């Protein structure tokens, strides 16, 4: 087994029917891992799993539904016998605009999905398996958790908090469980579409490496962090952004601001 080989390990990835989540599921499966991916609907979860292979199981589970999360963990243990990797990828941003324009309903939704759900899934996985046997957790945060971005204050606040939760969990769960965050920059996903779709050329030129990221760019980093090659890494927030935030803060703005 090489240090990047994931054979014999089992991963749960939330929100993995498309985009970064799907790319991570594909990459981990290619590395030999069994993968359980979740989506909000059974149809989307099954379709995503079918794209990848026989060692992948799709399950319907809304990120904040604790009963669904428990069921997913139970089924994973019954089917594959372990939970070695958890990637908390599910996220939402229903709240573009100024912070002073937000209401409690929006606040509650974005914090529940982006912050509470990763903590809940981690807690359940630790109690069911990882606490005794070890494992690796990745929380998908954002460069927005480290740098200001116009009109995304509430989303960014959840990602800043998630980075702090990641570090706290890394401390509390050591030495059995490693916990890290990945902070993607602008990636070609449906969630981020409003930030680049109508201005791809100028946005790309503002990134040091000259292009918007692809989901596979994040997937490669995730595969490294959950592997033995990263066995001495915990509590880190790894930025994967093509040099987007080198120098000044990001210059792009969401088209819906007007």
Located regions from the model:
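Short C-terminal tail/terminal secondary-structure segment
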Residues: 2, 93-96, 147, 223, ...
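Conserved glycine-rich cofactor-binding loop
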Residues: 10, 17-18
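Alpha-helical segment proximal to the catalytic Tyr-Lys
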Residues: 127, 170-175, 231
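Substrate-binding pocket helix/loop in short-chain dehydrogenase/reductase
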Residues: 97-99, 103-111, 203
């Amino acid at each position: 087994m090489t240090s990047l080989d994931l054979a014999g390990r089992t991963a749960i990835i939330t929100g993995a029917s498309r985009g970064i989540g799907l790319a991570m599921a594909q990459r981990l499966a290619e590395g030999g891992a069994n993968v359980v991916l979740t989506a909000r609907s059974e149809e989307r979860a099954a379709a995503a799993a079918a794209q990848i292979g026989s060692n992948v199981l799709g399950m319907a589970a809304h990120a904040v539904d604790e009963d669904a999360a428990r069921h997913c963990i139970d089924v994973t243990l019954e089917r594959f016998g372990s939970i070695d990797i958890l990637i908390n990828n599910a996220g939402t941003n229903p709240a573009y605009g100024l912070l002073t324009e937000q209401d409690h309903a929006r606040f509650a939704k974005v914090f529940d999905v982006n912050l509470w759900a990763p903590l809940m899934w981690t807690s359940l996985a630790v109690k069911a398996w990882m606490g005794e046997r070890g494992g690796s957790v990745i929380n998908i945060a954002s460069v927005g958790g480290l740098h200001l971005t116009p009109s995304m204050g509430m989303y960014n606040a959840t990602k800043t908090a998630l980075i702090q939760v990641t570090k706290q969990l890394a401390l509390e769960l050591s030495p059995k469980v490693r916990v890290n965050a990945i902070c993607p920059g602008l990636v070609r996903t449906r969630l981020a579409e409003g930030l680049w779709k109508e201005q791809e050329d100028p946005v790309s030129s503002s990134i040091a490496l000259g292009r918007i990221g692809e989901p596979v760019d994040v997937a490669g980093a995730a595969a490294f962090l959950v592997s033995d090659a990263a066995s001495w890494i915990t509590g880190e927030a790894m930025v994967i952004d093509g040099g987007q935030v080198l120098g000044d803060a990001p210059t792009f703005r969401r088209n819906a601001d007007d």
